[in-house]
């Protein structure tokens, strides 16, 4: 097996045992990126020179017997809306095309302390607004399983990079499903932690009450390790919760026979038959090891998407007001201040961003605040209450991650409602602030399908426990079809 094909834990063990050096590993990763990037287009920015220099330094420290962090010498990709000091953070937008942050996001500082090496910044939907990574201002990222299809979004670059074996670990952000949906589409594992578990400091905000940073990796074990690294209270983030963080890897390999697993019926009614069949088949496969299955109902789910697409754009319209050409980012050259504001935003923002900002501004306007935004907040409260009620009876919920398999590039570009429906199974979890992980559960016509395990607030451990057991029992990749990427020279 080539170095770039190894999982995060395999890489970690190999480095610690001296089977290969960090420089060899990082070189292998960049060779793989060079080999596949023309077909995938996962990266906006690569940091090869810095990464190789860092790998040599870590190899030197390891040779001297110095104490190193848990991710020392391991390459990681970062979604391009997470601030990286001295490395461009564009949010896949023209308005921030040349923006270089003067500081690191807290999660980047935590990765640095752990010894991780950043190999580049991944493509995304502009300002994380989208479900296909087609809204990037620069280029469209492709799905490694079929390069004519989308990888999902908005963290499509991160998911595609892990799926195509460019890196063992990537970070993304999840506002309404932006880690889990691309994880499902690309056949990788993606986790949205509880709101407040991972610091948002340094994440360029889309919707501040919904955004959460999380990992994407090749398996649940790797995700648990990554979550251990990036979790924890941060005084720089007022929404960060000061709770002790458990060792999430301790929950691996634990039995689930005493747990009650809820099956939310509404989620299964909202998805295509092939997706539904695969998730239900997975439930049957793990039944001998599982505890009790309980059919549960979350009736407000049918209104969740409407509430989400009022609350998120409303918050975005406020957050994106800071991009005005005055302090940072692109600026339209003119002597008139009003013209500068208007033209900077007109030329700097893409159509989807403008559309959502306008929708959010409308929802917050005096005549519609009560009828739209306030009502959406009430629906959000109902969704939270329903989850609380269900979790008084269940330990976790298992549901489909996405309603469909990956769709073709361009198929839904002119149909925003169909595009927005991709979030129907994921957005309610963000509205409730709960943890959820998407794991592969099979293939439909050669395309990956994911299921998600949803847990109680700050109970990521149980989510990982159940997801790992499912992963072990399904062994999805034992008889997996060949990636379309492999037929295009990306072997």
Swiss-Prot record:
It catalyses: L-glutamyl-tRNA(Gln) + L-glutamine + ATP + H2O = L-glutaminyl-tRNA(Gln) + L-glutamate + ADP + phosphate + H(+). The active site is at 79 (charge relay system), 154 (charge relay system), 178 (acyl-ester intermediate). One of its GO terms (molecular function) is glutaminyl-tRNA synthase (glutamine-hydrolyzing) activity. One of its GO terms (biological process) is translation. Keywords: ATP-binding, Ligase, Nucleotide-binding, Protein biosynthesis. Its EC number is 6.3.5.7. One of its GO terms (cellular component) is glutamyl-tRNA(Gln) amidotransferase complex. Pfam families: Amidase. InterPro entries: Amidase (IPR000120), Amidase_CS (IPR020556), Amidase_dom (IPR023631), AS_sf (IPR036928), GatA (IPR004412). Allows the formation of correctly charged Gln-tRNA(Gln) through the transamidation of misacylated Glu-tRNA(Gln) in organisms which lack glutaminyl-tRNA synthetase. The reaction takes place in the presence of glutamine and ATP through an activated gamma-phospho-Glu-tRNA(Gln). HAMAP family: GatA. Belongs to the amidase family. GatA subfamily. Heterotrimer of A, B and C subunits. NCBIfam families: gatA. PANTHER family: GLUTAMYL-TRNA(GLN) AMIDOTRANSFERASE SUBUNIT A, TRANSAMIDASE. This is Glutamyl-tRNA(Gln) amidotransferase subunit A. The lineage of its organism: Bacteria, Bacillati, Bacillota, Clostridia, Natranaerobiales. The gene is gatA.
């Amino acid at each position: 097996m080539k170095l770039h094909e190894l999982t995060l834990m395999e890489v970690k063990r190999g480095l610690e045992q001296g089977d290969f050096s960090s420089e060899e590993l990082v070189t292998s990763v960049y060779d793989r990126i060079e080999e596949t990037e023309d077909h995938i287009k996962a990266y906006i920015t690569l940091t090869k020179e810095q990464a190789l220099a860092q790998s040599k330094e870590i190899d030197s420290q390891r040779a001297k017997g110095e104490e190193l962090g848990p991710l020392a010498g391991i390459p990681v990709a970062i979604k391009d809306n997470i601030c990286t000091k001295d490395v461009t953070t564009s949010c896949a937008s023209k308005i921030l095309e040349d923006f270089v942050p003067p500081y690191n996001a807290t999660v980047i500082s935590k990765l640095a302390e752990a010894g991780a090496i950043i190999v580049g910044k991944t493509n995304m939907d502009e300002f994380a607004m989208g479900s296909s990574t087609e809204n990037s201002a620069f280029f469209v990222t492709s799905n490694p399983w079929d390069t004519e299809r989308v990888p999902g979004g908005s963290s499509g670059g991160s998911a595609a990079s892990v799926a195509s074996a460019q890196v063992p670990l990537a970070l993304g952000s999840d506002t309404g499903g932006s880690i889990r949906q691309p994880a499902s589409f690309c056949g990788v594992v993606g986790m949205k932690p509880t709101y407040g578990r991972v610091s948002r400091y340094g994440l360029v905000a889309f919707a501040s009450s919904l955004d959460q940073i999380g990992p994407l990796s090749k398996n649940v074990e790797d995700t648990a390790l990554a979550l251990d690294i990036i979790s924890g209270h941060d005084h720089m983030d007022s929404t960060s919760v000061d709770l002790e963080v458990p060792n999430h890897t301790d929950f691996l390999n634990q039995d689930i026979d005493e747990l009650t697993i809820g099956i939310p019926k509404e989620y299964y009614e909202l998805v295509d038959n092939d997706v539904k069949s695969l998730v239900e088949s997975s439930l049957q496969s793990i039944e001998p090891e599982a505890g009790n299955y309980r059919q549960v109902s979350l009736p407000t789910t049918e209104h969740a998407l409407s509430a989400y697409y009022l609350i998120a754009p409303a918050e975005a319209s406020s957050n994106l007001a800071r991009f005005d050409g005055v302090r940072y980012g692109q600026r339209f050259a003119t002597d008139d201040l009003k013209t500068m504001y208007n033209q900077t935003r007109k030329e700097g923002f893409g159509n989807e961003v403008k559309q959502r900002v306008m929708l959010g501004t409308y929802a917050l306007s005096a005549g519609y605040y009560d009828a739209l935004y306030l009502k959406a907040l009430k629906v959000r409260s109902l969704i939270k209450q329903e989850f609380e009620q269900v979790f008084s009876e269940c330990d976790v919920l298992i549901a489909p991650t996405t309603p469909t398999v990956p769709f073709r590039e361009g198929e839904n570009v002119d149909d925003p409602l169909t595009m927005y429906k991709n979030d129907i199974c994921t957005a309610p979890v963000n509205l409730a602030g709960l943890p959820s992980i998407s794991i592969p559960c099979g293939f439909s016509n050669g395309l990956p399908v994911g299921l998600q395990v949803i847990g109680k607030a700050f109970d990521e451990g149980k989510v990982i426990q159940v997801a790992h057991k499912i992963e072990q029992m399904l062994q999805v990749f034992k008889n997996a079809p060949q990636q379309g990427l492999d037929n295009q020279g990306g072997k």
